[in-house]
Amino acid sequence: MGSNQRIVITPGEPAGIGPDLVAALAQQAWPVELVICADPALLTARAQQLGLPLRLHSYRPEQPATPRPAGELTVLAIDTPAPVAAGELNVANSHYVVETLARACDSCLNGEFAALLTGPVHKGVINDGGLPFSGHTEYFAQRSGRERVVMMLATESLRVALATTHLPLLAVPGAVTRQSLDEVITILVHDLQQQFGIAQPCIYVCGLNPHAGEGGHMGREEIEVITPALDTLRAKGYNLVGPLPADTLFQPKYLQQADAVLAMYHDQGLPVLKYQGFGRAVNITLGLPFIRTSVDHGTALELAGSGQAEAGSIKTALNIAIDMIKHRNE
């Protein structure tokens, strides 16, 4: 995997299940050093609340990466300014959440870490704290100086990328342009090759409108925007199928041929994927200068500290990040 064997993890909202999931990760050994960017007192208290053993080591960037045995983690300490109670949001800690994201992102940009894994944040309380925040994907893109990144969610058998992300449905048609599709598909194909080891990815592309526009009778975006964009990329050797109606495309006989599906908007593609693999799916940001994976669920405040939070998604996200590091280093 190379000399850089550290993955930084941000637990996210301190009152949510993020700290629980980190404590769960610590219960097994991993082939990389996990560095948790968080308040060590928070991690210790939550592990004690859950009855899980946890020993913390201070992060020392000058020392070689050291994978820890079960029950131990490395922590890059950032303290919460206000007390944390499991399940109870506190707007006073919203700046802390963003500070952990900034520190982790900057440390990936300077090469300290091979990948970043994010736990769930609560966007509402961050915005209530006076920090405009629409999501991890947009935040990391802006901080990394990338104008275009791609959100992709993945299960063991399905990958769904999005042409647009957190936009009102009314704004989607205007955001789907020939240029935007060219940029999104170029990033998608490049990262499937470089980070997933797929030499010639086959991408199935959804139409925007019902029945993919029905020959222009239900919208003309497929004729005037999507098909011309795909034809231009096909001429460069890209393996693209579509645009196809989404309700046709998301059938097993089509999906088994696809390395990834490109949906035009958030709620076109993600309900299918989450129905198939909720709790086991992973959110991946493509197009960043570093590897970033995330859980596919929210903060689940009602489960924080209860011992009932499922760690399947964060474990899958960590395993995928490790695999992506291997492919990138090949």
UniProtKB/Swiss-Prot annotation:
<feature type="binding site">
    <location>
        <position position="274"/>
    </location>
    <ligand>
        <name>substrate</name>
    </ligand>
</feature>
<keyword id="KW-0664">Pyridoxine biosynthesis</keyword>
<keyword id="KW-0560">Oxidoreductase</keyword>
<keyword id="KW-0963">Cytoplasm</keyword>
<feature type="binding site">
    <location>
        <position position="166"/>
    </location>
    <ligand>
        <name>a divalent metal cation</name>
    </ligand>
</feature>
<protein>
    <recommendedName>
        <fullName>4-hydroxythreonine-4-phosphate dehydrogenase</fullName>
        <ecNumber>1.1.1.262</ecNumber>
    </recommendedName>
</protein>
<feature type="binding site">
    <location>
        <position position="266"/>
    </location>
    <ligand>
        <name>a divalent metal cation</name>
    </ligand>
</feature>
<dbReference type="GO" id="GO:0000287">
    <property type="term" value="F:magnesium ion binding"/>
</dbReference>
<keyword id="KW-0479">Metal-binding</keyword>
<feature type="binding site">
    <location>
        <position position="136"/>
    </location>
    <ligand>
        <name>substrate</name>
    </ligand>
</feature>
<dbReference type="GO" id="GO:0042823">
    <property type="term" value="P:pyridoxal phosphate biosynthetic process"/>
</dbReference>
<comment type="subunit">
    <text>Homodimer.</text>
</comment>
<dbReference type="GO" id="GO:0050897">
    <property type="term" value="F:cobalt ion binding"/>
</dbReference>
<comment type="similarity">
    <text>Belongs to the PdxA family.</text>
</comment>
<dbReference type="GO" id="GO:0050570">
    <property type="term" value="F:4-hydroxythreonine-4-phosphate dehydrogenase activity"/>
</dbReference>
<dbReference type="Pfam" id="PF04166">
    <property type="entry name" value="PdxA"/>
</dbReference>
<keyword id="KW-0520">NAD</keyword>
<dbReference type="GO" id="GO:0008615">
    <property type="term" value="P:pyridoxine biosynthetic process"/>
</dbReference>
<dbReference type="GO" id="GO:0051287">
    <property type="term" value="F:NAD binding"/>
</dbReference>
<keyword id="KW-0460">Magnesium</keyword>
<keyword id="KW-0862">Zinc</keyword>
<feature type="binding site">
    <location>
        <position position="292"/>
    </location>
    <ligand>
        <name>substrate</name>
    </ligand>
</feature>
<feature type="binding site">
    <location>
        <position position="137"/>
    </location>
    <ligand>
        <name>substrate</name>
    </ligand>
</feature>
<feature type="binding site">
    <location>
        <position position="211"/>
    </location>
    <ligand>
        <name>a divalent metal cation</name>
    </ligand>
</feature>
<comment type="function">
    <text>Catalyzes the NAD(P)-dependent oxidation of 4-(phosphooxy)-L-threonine (HTP) into 2-amino-3-oxo-4-(phosphooxy)butyric acid which spontaneously decarboxylates to form 3-amino-2-oxopropyl phosphate (AHAP).</text>
</comment>
<dbReference type="InterPro" id="IPR037510">
    <property type="entry name" value="PdxA"/>
</dbReference>
<keyword id="KW-0521">NADP</keyword>
<dbReference type="InterPro" id="IPR005255">
    <property type="entry name" value="PdxA_fam"/>
</dbReference>
<feature type="binding site">
    <location>
        <position position="283"/>
    </location>
    <ligand>
        <name>substrate</name>
    </ligand>
</feature>
<keyword id="KW-0170">Cobalt</keyword>
<comment type="pathway">
    <text>Cofactor biosynthesis; pyridoxine 5'-phosphate biosynthesis; pyridoxine 5'-phosphate from D-erythrose 4-phosphate: step 4/5.</text>
</comment>
<dbReference type="GO" id="GO:0008270">
    <property type="term" value="F:zinc ion binding"/>
</dbReference>
<dbReference type="GO" id="GO:0005737">
    <property type="term" value="C:cytoplasm"/>
</dbReference>
